[in-house]
Amino acid sequence: MSELPGRILTKRLPPVSRLAFGSLTVGPLQADLTPERAGEVLSYAFDRGINFLDTAQYYRNYAHIRAGLQKCRRPEDVMISSKTYAYDRAGALEAVDEARLALDRDVIDLFMLHEQESIHTLRGHREALDTLFALREKGVIRAVGISTHHTAAVEGVLQLAEEGVVLDVVHPLFNKAGIGIADGTPADMAAVLTRLHDTGCGIFGMKALAGGHLFQNAGEALAYVLEQPFMDAVAVGMQDEAEIDANIAFFTTGAFPANTRSLEKIRRRLHIEEYCEGCGRCVRRCQQGALVLTESKEETENPYDFGAAFAASEGIVSAGEPVSRTVAAVDPDKCVLCGYCTAVCPVFALKVY
């Protein structure tokens, strides 16, 4: 069996497997596996050689990861990257302490600011960033970085470096089609990532398959990302052992095995349940502009079988009369299946499966 290839992501960490486990998929925002089942999946991945995992405070899946670490043979070999939306010192300290306690780890390998957009958001989160640097110096975390969907944020990291504020790692959205890149093309993102990587900053990508949009040409899409000289590792979401086997095969041999189930057969999408209340929180949360509020016409039920005239006189809508209500709708061509909208829905009407 071929060994899973590794790379130096940053001098502050041992080599990481180029295939990183994107753990969003196993938690409550996507597949919603139980911690027990997720632990089985994760430990299988770790025992097969994946030694790098991406998570976030927002994902609410630390219990799942802890179960995987407890089940695997060598938990000490697994490096964990987490992220936080914290913007001040108190929030950053709380986020790191939460991860350490929930994961039962004294040290978190990589901690990042989540979803940065530009130099302006980096400056707005500077207190949290400085706190992460201080924790790195104390040995509580080993490396510091950001995640982003924006070329402008990568430019911002370069600008900070010129000012003497040097990040260890950047975790950008990058795929062949450019789906999900908020402010440019794949060529734009590749150009700025090349400049950043040349400074010594580590880069591990996300959304290589664009949240499932590129499943039908998964091999071509993954190869494109892995062939980029600046790409040290790639986080790929996986939900079961079969997906782990398929991706490990590709990362080690450059091809999916013939007996692997077709990836297009497991294509996922965002589902919006009928009981959506149309509050608009998901629309405001979506950075891709994939969600909108729309009017839905529905026929009403009249359990009392009132006549139309009587119903009208009493202000009651007659049975079968269409009424309009506001609900959320998704544009599947824009949705990257990040699942972040599901976390803000008060009635859990959004699900990725």
Go through each PLM region and give its residues.
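Conserved, mostly hydrophobic/aromatic
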Residues: 9, 21, 45, 53, ...
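N-terminal binding-site loop/beta-alpha segment at the start of enzyme catalytic domains
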Residues: 1-76, 137
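Beta/alpha (TIM)-barrel catalytic core signal, keyed to glycine-rich beta->alpha loops juxtaposed to Asp/Glu
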Residues: 116-277, 281, 289, 322
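Acidic (Asp/Glu)-rich catalytic clusters
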Residues: 10-16, 47, 66-77, 97-106, ...
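Active-site mouth loops of central-metabolism enzymes
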Residues: 24-36, 81-91, 117-119, 214-216
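Iron-sulfur cluster-binding cysteine motifs and their immediate structural context
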Residues: 57, 281-299, 307-322, 340-353
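Short, acidic/polar
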Residues: 31-45, 89-104, 150-160, 216-224
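Active-site groove signature of glycoside hydrolases
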Residues: 100-120
